[in-house]
């Protein structure tokens, strides 16, 4: 009731005030009633939660003093700052300011904060302890001087939080490091792997080169071992004989009658295609031995071409034995040399009978061993073939020759024994083709000349023996002797004494003289000095 009375009083006083003219001004001071009314309005506004200002007059020139106080009472509260903190995942949430609309208060929990509009839901941030990095987190402490601790536009850190709240957020989100050391580790690992690969490749290349060198030495040791065996079998005192026997056809009149053949390297299995033996100048006799010894020396194998190893591998079957090498060398020698003397180790195909002696024979018709060139060698050499060395002996497959002294004694035995002479003739000629003995000395000379031409080979013109006149039918005997014709010289001479054999049809020629050595079973008498203990006659 008292309040209603007061309101009535106030309304009446306000009506009286409005009844006054607006432009009138009172000079007298105001009474105590308006002051009392103003005090009452303030009290009622405080009790009701805010009172409105007095409504303006009609012309809007007056405003009640209570209007300013109501506007100040309705102003929004200041914005609150939520400080940065570490959440439950160990991640740092930066500081933010609650200044949007009516959301002026920092609410929530210590590990999850947000802005709200209710004052009673405010969070006491000073009571939280998650402003530092947790112990279980692996992130290093952030560097000082970061900008993460800067506050919002309208606020700052609370009282007592300037140091420990800003220090908790230094470096911002870049505080979680580790990228630098991880990148350098990757580079180091890649470098180590590359270095290991390079070392492995280099080691493999070096090992392959080291293993290839012993293999080449093993390949070349086989022919070198064979050369070493031949040099040891030849002996230290056989070099003069080797030098003499290397020239297959020395001249009869002397060493200057014919230039010696160019010495051939017997150990070189690869022929040089651009060299010809006819274009080479003949060496002097003084340099013959030195050239031969150097070409056949065991230590002069450095002249072999680079393809020596490949030639040894591809030609291993062809040059596997000394017998094949001897055949090849002897074929070339028969094609290139001139027939100047009888080969060693051969006997005439027909023996001579002294007329009227009844089987007795003499050496005077043939001449002495010195005239026939059958003088014994000072140091004969013999070389066993490779098949004989590596096999079971095999003596039945070869025909071994004898020294010259023993050949002369064997010739004496054949001339003194008719039975041995008959067996020798049966061995050299087929039984139905064995001719009769020559009747006179003229026929003996003709027969000896024909045998000389037979044994000398097809290299040049026929040359008679020393001390014997050349016969008239020398070419015919040479042809028949080479092609196996059994008709001797005295069978074509009707005036010869002692009787003749019945005539046989001449042998039909199957090939030329050069093709004879390539026909199977028609090889010429061949003999090779091979510097071994057992000479091989092919």
Curated annotation (Swiss-Prot):
Q: Give the Phosphothreonine positions (modified residues).
A: 512
What range does the record give for the signal peptide? 1-19
Q: Which UniProt keywords apply?
A: Cell membrane, Glycoprotein, Membrane, Phosphoprotein, Postsynaptic cell membrane, Signal, Synapse, Transmembrane, Transmembrane helix
Q: Where is the composition biased (Low complexity)?
A: 55-64, 443-456
Residues with the modification Phosphoserine, per the entry, are 417
Q: Locations of Pro residues compositional bias?
A: 432-441, 459-472
Positions on the Extracellular side per record topology: 20-186
Question: What spans does the record annotate as topological domain Cytoplasmic, numbered to this chain?
Answer: 208-538
Q: Where is this motif: PDZ-binding?
A: 535-538
Q: How does it assemble?
A: Interacts with GABA(A)R (GABA type A receptor) subunits GABRA1, GABRA2 and GABRG2; the interaction is direct. Does not interact with GABRB2 and GABRB3 subunits. May interact with AMPAR subunits GRIA1, GRIA2 and GRIA3 and AMPAR auxiliary proteins SHISA6 and SHISA7. May interact (via PDZ-binding motif) with DLG4/PSD-95 (via PDZ domain); the interaction is direct.
State what this protein does.
Transmembrane protein that regulates gamma-aminobutyric acid type A receptor (GABA(A)R) trafficking, channel deactivation kinetics and pharmacology, necessary for fast inhibitory transmission in the brain. Enhances the action of benzodiazepine, a primary GABA(A)Rs target drug, in the brain. May affect channel kinetics of AMPA-type glutamate receptors (AMPAR), the brain's main excitatory neurotransmitter, necessary for synaptic hippocampal plasticity, and memory recall. May regulate the induction and maintenance of long-term potentiation at Schaffer collaterals/CA3-CA1 excitatory synapses.
User: Member of which family?
Assistant: Belongs to the shisa family.
Protein name as it appears in the record:
Protein shisa-7
């Amino acid at each position: 009731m008292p309040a209603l009375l007061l309101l009535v009083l106030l309304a009446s006083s306000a009506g009286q005030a409005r009844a006054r003219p607006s432009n009138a001004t009172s000079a007298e001071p105001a009474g105590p009633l308006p002051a009392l009314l103003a005090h009452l309005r303030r009290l009622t506004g405080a009790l009701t939660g805010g009172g409105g200002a007095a409504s303006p007059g009609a012309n809007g020139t007056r405003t009640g003093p209570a209007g300013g106080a109501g506007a100040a009472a309705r102003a929004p509260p200041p914005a609150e700052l939520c400080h940065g903190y570490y959440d439950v995942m160990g991640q740092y949430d930066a500081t933010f300011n609650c200044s949007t609309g009516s959301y002026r208060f920092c609410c929530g929990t210590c590990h999850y904060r947000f802005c709200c509009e209710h004052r009673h839901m405010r969070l006491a941030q000073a009571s939280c302890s998650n402003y530092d990095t947790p112990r279980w987190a692996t992130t290093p402490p952030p560097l000082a001087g970061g900008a993460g601790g800067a506050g919002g536009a309208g606020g700052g850190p609370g009282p007592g939080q300037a140091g420990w709240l800003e220090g908790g957020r230094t470096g911002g989100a870049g505080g979680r490091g580790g990228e630098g050391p991880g990148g350098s580790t990757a580079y180091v690992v890649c470098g180590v792997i590359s270095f290991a690969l390079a070392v492995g490749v280099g080691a493999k290349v070096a090992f392959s080169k080291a293993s290839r060198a012993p293999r080449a030495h093993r390949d070349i040791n086989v022919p070198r071992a064979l050369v070493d065996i031949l040099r040891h079998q030849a002996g230290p005192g056989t070099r003069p004989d080797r030098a003499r026997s290397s020239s297959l056809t020395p001249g009869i009149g002397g060493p200057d009658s014919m230039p010696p053949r160019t010495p051939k390297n017997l150990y070189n299995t690869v022929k040089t295609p651009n060299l010809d033996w006819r274009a080479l100048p003949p060496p002097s006799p003084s340099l013959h031995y030195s050239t031969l010894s150097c070409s056949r020396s065991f230590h002069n194998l450095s002249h072999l071409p680079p393809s020596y190893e490949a030639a040894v591998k591809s030609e291993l079957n062809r040059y596997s034995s000394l017998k094949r090498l001897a055949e090849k060398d002897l074929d070339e020698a028969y094609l290139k040399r001139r027939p100047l003397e009888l080969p060693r180790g051969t006997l005439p195909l027909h023996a001579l009978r002294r007329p009227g002696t009844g089987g007795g024979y003499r050496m005077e018709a043939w001449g002495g061993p010195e005239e026939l060139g059958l003088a014994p060698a000072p140091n004969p050499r013999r070389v066993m073939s490779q098949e004989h060395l590596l096999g079971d002996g095999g003596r039945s497959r070869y025909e071994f020759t004898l020294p010259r002294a023993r050949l002369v004694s064997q010739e004496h035995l054949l001339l003194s024994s008719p039975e041995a002479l008959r067996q020798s003739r049966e061995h050299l000629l087929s039984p139905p083709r064995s001719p009769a003995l020559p009747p006179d000395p003229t026929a003996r000379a003709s027969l000896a000349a024909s045998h000389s031409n037979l044994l000398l080979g097809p290299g040049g013109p026929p040359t008679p023996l020393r001390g014997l006149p050349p016969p008239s039918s020398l070419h015919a005997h040479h042809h028949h002797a080479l092609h196996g014709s059994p008709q001797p010289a005295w069978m074509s001479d009707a005036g010869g004494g002692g009787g003749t054999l019945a005539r046989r049809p001449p042998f039909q020629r199957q090939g030329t003289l050069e093709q004879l050595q390539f026909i199977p079973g028609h090889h010429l008498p061949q003999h090779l000095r091979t510097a071994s203990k057992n000479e091989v006659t092919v």
